Amino acid sequence: MFAHEFNHFPPSLSNSGEMNYPSNKASLIHEILTDCHNAPDEPSEFDPTSAVLIDGGRLLHQFPPRPLMTFRQYAEMLSKGPISLYLQHHQRMDIVFDTYIDGSLNAATRQGRGKGLRQRVAAETKCPAKWSQFLKDTRNKKELNIFLAQQLTTYSYPEGRQFFATCEEKVLSNTSFTMADSDQEGADTRLMLHAKHCLSEGLNRIKILIDDTDVIVIALGIFHKLQSSYHFDDIVIEFGINKNHRSVSLKALANSLGPSRCLAIPLLHTLSGSESTSALKGIGKKKAYEALKAYKESEAILGDYFSNAFKTLNEGDSAFKTIQRLVILMYARTSILESIDDLRMELYFQRSQNIELIPPTSNALYLHTLRCIYQAGVWSLCLLPFQNRPSPCEYGWQKTNHTSMYQPVWITKGEAIKECREFVKCSCKSEICTRCKCKNAILRCTLLCSCKCDDRVSFD
């Protein structure tokens, strides 16, 4: 019975059928930084032949418009303020915005972030007072990103400096230098594409300013590939503001972790919860990372599925058995079990029969792993302008007739209440039951019962 979920969605992965997003997905980075003492917190100063890349979302949140500003005045403020300041110290600056595509997988995962205030963007229209609410509406952000990219590339900057801004699939510039179009939707992956372009142009030190620590996870996964193709001093990633500001040398961090663990971290991150994958309830990033360190054999499997984007995984594969074992160690560090379904029964009795605190079934975990492999595959191909991604429907997602949005396929095995004739257990203290819930329901006792009946039904 424990090979079946108790409902049509797994409580360990979902909230009443909705994705259970992690409350603090950045904590994985903090665990990694704590573990790697050789990674300096503050890098040395950049030389004048460096580049700075910034996530457009960070720019918009860090530098909101002043009261009563029009959108044109806001663009001028950004140009004369932070952009000009960055270009005084760097040869090149790139702003990378998200692209918003209706009906995409990213569009489905953005639904959980709340709805904002709709306002059209035009040069002489005043910016809204409730800026954070304005930025919650993807239609607003799409129009704003296009407007800013077009405006910012028309202004004058220090002589000889290069400025690039993404505008949907295109990349605009203030110079004759060009970059290839790209169908990458997220700024987190497209920043890596721009970093690669900087390195190919001979810039040897890059600073990346981010709003989302997923960028560090992605960068670790592809760092050694970049290092084998280009000669450069370092890539430094900055995140957080004020007292939470951190500056990380990617080179020092990647060399401290080693190639094998760097490749494993992206898929580990998706397994323990990311923007498009559920978190396991009760299992934070710390437990996930500790399990990876304890079970070193899993590094090669996770790394292989990141390196070989969208690689096929079947439920009976040895690779999935390794992933099962890794998740088992997230829940019970000393367990010797190989089957997560066996662990479900063991933990069910240990944890006061709270089904949210036991792991998903092997079937639900398999479908969750497919969704994780898909997300890791998108990240893995971040150095390609056009990714040629397969359909998410091949990786644990579906589109139903009543919605154009992707929904997770939670289980393909019947739920326990349908597969088992009755979910009844008795609390008898005697050796043999005579009058109890099971007898009244004309059922044999099971291993869930407290009695010691000789004819109890097992769940094999």
Describe the function of each predicted region.
Residues M1-D460:
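Noncatalytic, typically N-terminal accessory segments of nucleic acid-processing enzymes
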